[in-house]
UniProtKB/Swiss-Prot annotation:
It is an enzyme of class 3 (hydrolase). Changing residue 1537 to E: Loss of cleavage by ced-3. Loss of deoxyribonuclease (DNase) activity. Reduced number of cell corpses in embryos. ATP binds at residues 33-40. Changing residue 1794 to A: Severe reduction in both dsRNA dicing and DNase activities. Loss of dsRNA dicing and DNase activities, bursting and protruding vulva and reduction in the number of cell corpses in embryos. GO terms for molecular function: ATP binding; deoxyribonuclease I activity; DNA binding; helicase activity; metal ion binding; ribonuclease III activity; RNA binding. Its EC number is 3.1.26.-, 3.1.21.-. Residues 1288-1304 have a biased composition (Acidic residues). Residues 1245-1280 form a coiled coil. This is Endoribonuclease dcr-1. Gene3D superfamilies: 3.30.160.20, Dicer dimerisation domain (3.30.160.380), P-loop containing nucleotide triphosphate hydrolases (3.40.50.300), paz domain (2.170.260.10), Ribonuclease III domain (1.10.1520.10). The keyword Zinc-finger does not apply. HAMAP family: RNase_III.
Length: 1910
């Protein structure tokens, strides 16, 4: 028979606040919670739950809620609080309110009509009731603050409740909620307490509920075995320590001296006493508590520490003397103790000098020694130690650790203990570096404890609370627990079954300890008896529970396929596990919601159960148990089993019956997540990443490949018509040469083709004569050529490429005139006739050239030269070559001008030679014969063959142009002659003079020469455009099923244009963010100048790669990347922040010098020295109402007083004065509240009592304060608990006069669980009935949705999402008339222009005039949007976690890469710069070697693996075979404990990324990264979207293989209203419920704010429902809508930015997009439109978060200054475990904003234009602000902030959640981590964190400039 442990058999409990709220709605309840821990939450949410009745009009049955407070000053405070969180109108009433309430009942009624909730003082409410202005039955909720006052028989609370009870007998009465601080004082006798609690319950007619975190711990925590060990007292004086008296005397005298000295003026001197007092205090405390050995050790530490302070900086003499005095005291104490202590080398020797508690401690530990367990305890399997030892003081923790380490080294039997310690930060100042270090150390130690690397943790109370520690089996309370909290918390840490909880106590404390523990246990019982979760019981009071075998009650569930079996006894645990795996934020624990239903069968009570899973689970309906069970527990188990069955059928549990958790998803994400751009060796590049590159063949267009011309067959003539559209830039033409427009030439070049070639767009090339537009024009008539002509043409063609263009120099090409050449068109010179635009081949010219085809230059014989006569005509438009120079590399010159006045005898422009004659004779031994010839002024012909880009003058020319020039270049002629000279490029404005006689004239004229130089660029571009035209045709046919793909004769494509083509354009594309800012500030002229300069500097590449940190870059710039990494590693973290400071060094056991900072005093000495300003912690002690003084103006209301921790000094006088000021009644009114002046004027009969109370309170507090201060002096390092429970002593409030009527009312404390279940369900039913009957406004069915006038705005209509973009030019135009042919949605015309397709295929690496980046940005966001839309509508019941995963898979780079590869995209991509000499194959040439490099072996295999993963198959883990390459890489990647870590080593990268690891054939192959292919796919999507509009694009995406919904596919959108709760008797239950929610959360009001009226209201309700709100079963939660809205917003905003007339460059576009599409912005907008008031949630953590955030936003006045901290604030999706308190932005708020966008999109029938109108209305200000002052990405900003010293050092992936954590190191010793869904987010978060911290430091520096001078 299976015995079931009861505690494993309950569903995970809800948050206690939610539990309380649930009870409070169903029955009258008194909630007792400390300040801040959620009373506010419960009150406000209770009011919201009654919203339906409150918002109903008063005359139609609406009710009112009253919030009754004790003191006037609380009225406003509570009212403000309620207003922040709800849409209620809140009225305030107290004695001084002047509203005419009292004048007449009408006035009062008017007031009630206007306000839903009234916050009122008790006396006023009583008066209103007594005067019959108000009736209790018209209220629906009555909340009493500080309800313990009701014990006073004369108190108005009591009087109101008396009336209430009388009414109760025959009228409906409101729900009562009493709020009070904790009623359990540790020192109250339990019996007495019980009696008082009952009294209070009776007075308030309510039940006290004791749920709290503490009680939950008692209830659900483990029950360890408790032991008290009594030890001998430790009296330090009786140990006979040598020199004992001297030591004590030194302590006393030094302390007295330090305390009484008046040497230091508080404002003028550097006061060193803090560290000195600390050193004395701690050493003395250790001496007294742990004995001389520990004190000896501590003294050493301090000696060193003080020494460090003395050396650390220049200090004034007086200060130094003081420090030295202290150091001497320490040395003396050390020396006095040393002789004896040094000898100790074993635990026996130590025994006499330590308390017995320590020895006992070691005895307990010894029982965990594996040998001891085997031999003495006869255990088979040793139990591993996992212990926590709690001590009160930080120093004791440290000293114990030292002792343990030494004993471990002395005694082999303790070798198994691995101790460490953990303490909290004292100061609350989290920005200080030491508490950061401390926090890091704490997390690190706890992580090692989790992994069992440490098995014994010594801790202060910091671990009792909050910090999650794994289960341990031994908890030792070294100092006995002094209060209930400490007892329960520390006990709750022993969670493992069978663990022990040991308290060590000395004999003198035994009695006290004993009675305390008894009380604690009694009180625990009382508390538990009042915290019953009846629907999820732990205890079962039905009899017969133990008697039978649970599993026999119901058949187990078996999965046939795998044989997995689930029994009843394990079902609950599985459901708990499933719920915890559902997506939720960090504040929300999703738990199942169970209800037990008692049923009478033949007089026997049996039980059914009903289970609701969290609302984001696909199973939305209640799971009901059909057959009743004999008791409650089994009913729970049975319903859980049924739920598991349904979950398995839904596919939520896999066939092994395990939740399909995030682990498997994380595993997959690992393959597809984008990877770090940091360098880490040995990590194989992932498929789809930019690191993984492969080789692909280059492709030649079909038309050019098949154009081989045969003799005597007809062929087409194609002419290259060049037309100049712009003169050459003056900078490029410094000598002001005149050029003719080639359009006017009588001849041009063209080529012959056997086939017709498709029309392609004209395109620009940039020649010396200016910028040309090239058109490919077909001659009207075909032609034929004879075999002889063909041969001549081939020779001519070959001549052009070899002789003129010098292409075959390297011998890698050979001419092939057959059809084998990949590109086989022949180039011919053409004559053109202007009149009819006809072209003919100029054979005469061909023959001439071919006839003169010798190797140029020809060297004339001497006699020929003597005959030479100069003829100017020969040199016009000629190309000349000097023949007396290097003939290997001939140099060609254009003759620019003939200089008739220059002769060879003219003066030579260089001092070394007199004349030209002399120069040539001396230099070349050449005599010039014709002395009458004119000289020539010439220009270089450039060998730059890439003319695709505008010419940029200040690029140094290739040296091959002028390898060894000896032209007489003035003034450097001689200099450039020597071979070594590097100045061979003459400055372009200097003239170059040549002598005609020494020249050879080239047969080809200069004008044609220019055109020939353009041929490679022209052919290269024509090929590209033809290829993209083929792609266009493929898409038309395959994606759109079009027959016709050819262009008609009368239309042509618009020409290919670059962004940089015109200067006008240059102002349009905004490149750098800085520029964008200037554009908005400076005048436009400056702007143009600046942009122009920018454009000249960059070659199109540099400005785009913004923000990628590459260590190599740094090295290049000369930054030293240092390798100091010694800050926080190893043992040196040991003493971090023990008091507060970091240090380096290592603790070794033998080393006597213990480096150990007790306080970072140096920081203290230089930091703020004004007493109070330095207090950092602020824990208020006085309960005021219930806020932690969250009064109206916290800044100027004085804090009650603060417990001081942290670095500040203690200014006792100031403190006492403060306490006096706050608690002196005569001044209290003015200080406690600025709003109410006379707080004590209230009906007179209470005055005296209140004053007495105040007086008493005041004296108590003063007394407390004094005690505290003394205690503080005594032991400042006692750790404080995180928060102090407020408690109320009920005795103070009761009085002896018992009211008579109380006797008659029996206490209503239900006796059994069944009775309570009954009571709760009746309460719930009643409320439901009233809700349903309350009048509803605005619940009519709506015909259609509409955008309200407030949101209508012309600017949002500047473009339409349904149509193509206005910003795109590349359409069809009517031939020559330049008029656009437009095409509408259904008619896609002829597809996308080849030039746009080409842009979409050109990477930025190609350094061309265009790149795909802008298209890629828009394509990326449209792809995300389309995929999301598809997934949302196809996976209808999947929760957001699975949707997100499916989306990441679909849009991942590896998926796009795989699709792109299938479509052959890589062969079309332009990935490298055009280099005519190396990587271009000219027409009619073939490479001389046919070598082709293969791809790496595993490339194929990896692609296939990814293919399998993306198809959703299971991945089998392959053992990776290590190659020699991987060995080095092992270190960088490791997986432990569910975290995979990749460390990026510090090293400069060697070599260049772009270089392939293997040689490959440049002519036929290209090397492209996977990511470029993915980018190109996105860019193609983008370009189709912008040219054709969205619907055709979806067809194209479908053709690509992406999953999208097509326009014409009708997708059934199920109604958002879920109808599970409808029943035959109540068919409209769900609609009614929706109406209730609609009214309760005031959604009509919200619609007005956002400017949109919903047709389907359920969408809006769903958009506001948080997963924690279990009551809404009619819509589901917002997670799916958020998933959709996220993509909708992203796409709309990106598209809007894209359409902006300022045409942002890709970098800016991306930055603006990430600045606008992020959680922080969305959350602030949500708060701006008060979404939080309509938020449907039950989640305390989130509630407090939102409250803080709303305050933050209103302080900033809702302005989104992107560069302010606001943009830096962290949202919860970015946070790391254990750092929850860092969050400032509640992600939920951003999520609602996104889900509202999703809701509008769906409600408007998926209409983006409508959605954009509404969203633009909300975001307009933000968007405009952002564009005017764009933020920089945090990564970039960090790089600039600390340029030299930033390094991203490692990345970890948490496998459970799939999140990524990235670490960044700044200035070597500061580390910040960031979390995120993927690497990119995490990296940005880490950068944000670092920046935030650096900004803080910066600010502190600015604020205290005077202090840095010390």
């Amino acid at each position: 028979m299976v015995r079931v442990r009861a505690d494993l058999q309950c569903f995970n409990p809800r948050d206690y606040q939610v539990e309380l709220l649930d009870k409070a709605t169903k029955k009258n309840t008194i909630v007792q919670l400390g300040t801040g821990s959620g009373k506010t939450f419960i009150a406000v949410l209770l009011l919201k739950e009654y919203g339906v009745q409150l918002f109903a009009p008063l005359d139609q049955g609406g009710k009112r809620a009253f919030f009754v407070v004790e003191k006037v000053n609380l009225v406003e405070q509570q009212a403000i609080h309620i207003e922040v969180h709800t849409s209620f109108k809140v009225g305030q009433v107290h004695g001084q309110t002047s509203s005419g309430l009292w004048d007449s009942k009408e006035q009062c009624d008017q007031f009630m009509k206007r306000h839903h909730v009234v916050v009122i003082t008790a006396q006023c409410l009583l008066d209103l009731i007594r005067h019959a202005y108000l009736k209790i039955e018209d209220m629906c909720v009555l909340i009493f603050d500080e309800c313990h006052h009701a014990l006073g028989s004369q108190h108005p609370y009591r009087s109101i409740m008396v009336d209430y009870k009388l009414l109760k007998k025959d009228k409906p009465v409101p729900r009562v909620l009493g709020l009070t601080a904790s009623l359990i004082k540790a020192k109250v006798a339990p019996e007495k307490l019980m009696e008082q609690l009952k009294k209070l319950e009776s007075a308030m007619d309510s039940v006290i509920e004791t749920a709290s975190d503490l009680v939950s711990l008692s209830k659900y925590g483990a029950k360890p075995y408790e032991v008290v060990i009594i030890c001998k007292d430790f009296e330090i004086g009786c140990l006979g320590i040598p020199n004992f008296d001297t030591v004590i005397e030194i302590f006393d005298e030094t302390v007295a001296f330090v305390n009484t000295t008046t040497e230091f003026h508080p404002d003028l001197d550097l006061d060193p006493r803090r560290p000195i007092k600390d050193s004395l205090k701690t050493t003395r405390a250790v001496f007294r508590q742990l004995g001389p050995w520990a004190a000896w050790r501590t003294a050493q530490v301090w000696e060193k520490e003080l020494g460090k302070i003395i050396k650390s900086q220049v200090l004034p003499d007086k200060t130094l003397r003081f420090l030295n005095m202290a150091k001497t005291s320490m040395i003396t104490i050390k020396r006095l103790l040393e002789p004896e202590m040094k000898k100790i080398k074993s635990i026996e020797a130590l025994r006499p000098y330590v308390p017995q508690r320590v020895i006992r401690l070691f005895e307990i530990l010894e029982t965990f020694n594996p040998e001891f367990q085997k031999e003495r305890m006869k255990l088979e399997k040793a139990e591993h130690l996992s212990a926590i030892i709690f001590v009160d003081q930080r120093y004791i923790a440290y000293s114990l650790l030292l002792m343990m380490r030494h004993i471990k080294s002395w005694e082999p039997k303790f070798k198994f203990v691995n101790p460490d310690y953990v303490v909290g930060a004292s100061g609350r100042n989290l920005a200080s570096s030491d508490s950061q270090g401390l926090h890091k150390r704490q997390t690190e130690v706890l992580r090692r404890f989790h992994r069992n690397e440490i098995n014994c943790l010594i801790a202060t109370s910091v671990l009792e609370e909050g910090v999650d520690v794994k289960q341990c089996n031994l908890v030792i309370k070294f100092d006995r627990p002094l209060d209930m909290r400490s007892y329960v918390q520390s006990k709750g840490r022993a969670r493992r079954a069978g663990s022990r909880y040991v308290i060590t106590v000395e004999e003198k404390d035994t009695a006290a300890c004993d009675s305390d523990l008894k009380d604690f246990q009694q009180i625990e019982k009382i508390l538990l008896s009042r915290h019953r979760t009846v629907n999820n019981p732990i205890e079962d009071d039905s009899d017969r529970f133990e008697e039978f075998d649970v599993d026999s009650q119901m058949e187990p569930y078996v999965v046939e396929k795998t044989g997995a079996t689930l029994k009843m006894s394990t079902a609950i645990a599985l459901i708990n596990r499933y719920c915890s795996k559902l997506p939720s934020d960090i504040f929300t624990r999703l738990v199942p919601h169970n209800q037990i239903i008692p049923i009478e069968e033949n007089g026997v009570t049996k039980y059914c159960a009903e289970l609701l899973l969290p609302i984001n689970s696909p199973i939305k309906h209640a799971i009901v148990l059909k057959n009743p069970m004999p008791n409650k527990k089994t009913a729970q188990m049975a319903v859980a089993l049924e739920a598991c069955r349904q979950l398995h059928l839904e596919g939520e549990l896999d066939d092994n019956l395990l939740p399909k958790g995030r682990e498997s998803i994380a595993k997959l994400l690992e393959h597809i997540d984008e990877e770090p751009d940091e360098y880490a060796p040995g990590i194989a590049a992932k498929v789809g990443s930019s690191k993984r590159k492969q080789l692909y063949d280059k492709k030649i267009a079909r038309a050019l490949n098949e154009s081989f011309v045969e003799a005597d067959k007809e062929c087409f003539i194609y002419a290259f018509e060049l037309e100049r559209f712009r003169e050459a830039e003056l900078t490029l033409n410094p000598k002001r040469r005149k050029f003719e427009d080639p359009f006017n030439y009588e001849y041009c070049f063209g080529f012959l083709s056997a086939k017709e070639i498709p029309k392609i767009p004209p395109f620009p090339v940039f020649l010396r004569q200016g910028n040309m537009k090239v058109r490919l024009i077909v001659a009207p008539k075909k032609t034929t050529v004879t075999a002889a002509q063909l041969q001549e043409i081939q020779l001519f063609h070959n001549y052009l490429f070899t002789q003129v263009l010098q292409m075959c120099k390297t011998g890698n090409l050979e001419f092939d005139g057959t059809s084998n050449a990949p590109l086989n068109t022949l180039i011919v010179p053409l004559n053109k006739r202007k009149d009819d635009m006809s072209y003919t081949i100029n054979m005469k010219y061909v023959s001439e050239v071919v006839a003169n085809m010798e190797n140029m230059p020809r060297i004339p014989k001497d006699e020929v030269r003597r005959q030479y006569k100069f003829n100017a005509e020969d040199y016009k438009d000629a190309i000349v070559m000097p023949w007396y120079r290097n003939l290997e590399q001939p140099v060609f010159y254009y003759v620019a001008e003939i200089l008739p006045e220059w002769r060879p005898s003219s003066k030579f422009p260089d001092t070394h030679f007199e004349t030209f004659n002399e120069y040539f004779i001396k230099k070349y031994k050449l005599e010039i014969y014709d002395q009458n010839q004119s000289l020539l002024d010439v220009d270089f012909t450039s060998t730059r063959l890439n003319l695709l880009q505008p010419r940029i003058q200040n690029q140094p020319r290739r040296s091959r142009t002028v390898s060894n020039s000896s032209t007489s270049n003035i003034p450097q002629a001689s200099a450039s002659d020597s071979k070594e000279s590097n100045t061979s490029v003459p400055h372009s404005s200097q003239r170059q003079i040549l002598v005609p006689e020494l020249m050879d004239i080239h047969p080809i004229s200069a004008t044609l020469w220019n055109v020939i130089a353009a041929l490679p660029s022209i052919f290269y571009r024509v090929n590209q455009l033809l290829l993209t035209d083929e792609l266009r045709e493929t898409i038309l046919v395959k994606a759109f099923g079009k027959e016709k793909t050819k262009l008609d004769d009368n239309v042509e494509w618009n020409s290919l244009a670059y962004a940089t083509e015109y200067e006008e354009k240059q102002t349009i594309i905004v490149k750098k963010i800085q520029q964008l800012r200037d554009l908005n500030q400076k005048s436009i002229e400056d702007q143009e100048r600046e942009t122009r300069e920018n454009d000249k500097i960059d070659d199109g590449e540099e400005l785009f790669n913004i923000g990628v940190w590459d260590p190599e870059e740094a090295v290049r710039i000369g930054v030293e990347i240092s390798s100091r990494d010694d800050r926080m590693d190893g043992e040196d973290q040991d003493t971090v922040g023990l008091t507060q400071g970091l240090h380096d060094g290592n603790i070794s056991d033998e080393d006597d010098e213990l480096p150990f900072v007790m306080h970072d005093y140096t920081a203290r000495l230089t930091s703020n020295r004004n007493g109070i300003g330095a207090w950092s912690g602020s824990e208020s002690i006085v309960p005021s109402g219930w806020g932690d003084w969250d009064g109206p103006e916290p800044d100027n209301s004085p804090m009650p007083f603060q417990i001081l921790g942290g670095p500040g000094g203690l200014n006792v006088q100031a403190l006492m004065a403060d306490v006096g000021r706050v608690f002196d009644p005569s001044t209290a009114s003015s200080s406690l509240s600025q709003t109410v002046q006379e707080s004590t004027v209230s009906p007179p009969k209470q005055l005296t009592k209140e004053e007495e109370q105040f007086k008493k309170l005041q004296n108590d507090l003063l007394k407390q304060a004094k005690e505290r201060l003394e205690a503080l002096e005594m032991s400042e390092d006692m750790e404080k608990p995180r928060r102090l429970e407020d408690t109320v002593n009920l005795e103070d409030y009761g009085d002896d006069q018992e009211n008579q009527e109380d006797e008659n009312t029996p206490t209503n404390f239900p006796k059994t669980i069944d009775e309570e279940i009954e009571e709760l369900s009746i309460g719930a039913r009643k409320k439901q009935e009233i809700d349903d009957n309350a009048a509803k406004t605005d619940v009519l069915e709506r015909e259609n949705c509409e955008v309200l006038p407030v949101a209508i705005n012309e600017k949002s209509r500047s473009f339409s999402f349904e149509k193509e973009s206005k910003a795109i030019n590349g359409r069809l135009i009517r031939q020559r008339s330049e008029e656009y042919v437009s095409h509408i949605d259904s008619d896609i015309g002829l597809g996308v222009s080849p030039c746009l397709l080409l842009t979409a295929l050109t990477t930025s690496n190609a350094a061309d005039g265009m790149s795909l980046e802008r298209f890629e940005t828009i394509g990326d966001s449209f792809l995300k949007f389309a995929t999301t839309d598809y997934l949302y509508h196809t996976l209808l019941d999947q929760h957001e976690g699975k949707l997100s995963f499916a989306r990441s898979k679909e849009v991942s780079n590896c998926n796009l890469y795989r699709l792109g590869k299938k479509l052959g995209i890589p062969q079309l991509i332009v990935a490298n710069k055009f280099d005519a000499h190396d990587s271009w194959l000219p027409p009619c040439y073939i490479p001389t070697c046919d070598f082709k490099a293969p791809n790496t072996d595993d490339a194929e295999e990896k692609d296939n693996e990814i293919e399998r993963i993306l198809d959703g198959q299971v991945i089998e883990e392959k053992p990776e075979n290590k190659t020699g390459w991987d060995i080095g890489g092992d270190v960088s990647k490791s997986t432990t404990d569910g975290i995979e870590t990749i460390t990026f080593p510090k090293q400069a990268r060697v070599g260049n990324d772009d270089i392939s690891p293997l040689p490959y054939n440049l002519l036929t192959q290209q090397h492209i990264s996977d990511k470029s292919i993915a980018d190109a796919v996105e860019a193609l999507i983008g370009v189709h979207l912008l040219t054709l509009g969205p619907n055709p694009t979806l067809k194209v995406m479908n053709w690509m293989g992406l999953k999208v919904i097509q326009k014409d596919q009708k997708s059934d959108v199920p109604s958002p209203l879920l109808r599970f709760i409808d029943t035959p008797t109540n068919p409209n239950a769900s609609l009614n419920f929706l109406n209730n929610l609609w009214q309760q959360f005031q959604f009509t009001q919200l619609e007005e704010k956002i400017g949109y009226r919903f047709k389907e209201r359920a969408y809006l309700v769903q958009a506001f429902t948080h997963a924690s709100y279990i009551n809404n079963r009619v819509t589901g939660c917002y997670q799916r809508l958020e998933f959709l809205g996220d993509a909708v917003l992203d796409y709309m905003i990106t598209r809007y930015l894209f359409e902006d007339s300022r045409q942002y460059s890709p970098g800016v576009l991306t930055d603006l997009r990430s600045a606008l599409v992020n959680n922080t912005i969305f959350a602030s907008l949500a708060v701006k439109f008060e979404f939080q008031k309509h938020f449907i949630a039950m989640c305390p953590g989130l509630y407090h978060m939102i409250e803080k955030f709303v305050k933050l936003c209103s302080e900033r006045n809702f302005d989104t200054n992107f560069n302010a901290e606001m943009y830096m604030v962290t949202t919860e999706e970015e946070i790391d475990e254990g750092q929850e308190e860092d969050i400032e932005v509640p992600k939920a708020m951003g999520d609602i904003f996104e889900s509202v966008a999703g809701a509008i999109y769906l409600d408007s029938g998926r209409n983006l234009d409508t959605t954009w109108q509404v969203i633009f209305h909300m975001m307009r200000g933000t968007i405009e602000l952002c564009c005017a002052n764009p933020p920089r990405s945090p990564i970039r900003e960090l790089m600039e902030f600390e340029q030299s010293k930033v390094r991203f050092s490692k990345m970890e992936r948490i496998l459970e959640s799939g999140k990524v954590r990235v670490t960044v190191e700044v200035v070597n010793n500061m580390r910040f981590t960031g979390m995120g869904r993927n690497y990119r987010i995490a990296k940005a978060t880490a950068a944000k964190r670092a920046l935030k911290y650096l900004h803080q430091i910066e600010q502190q520096r600015r604020q205290s400039p005077s202090l840095t001078t010390v």
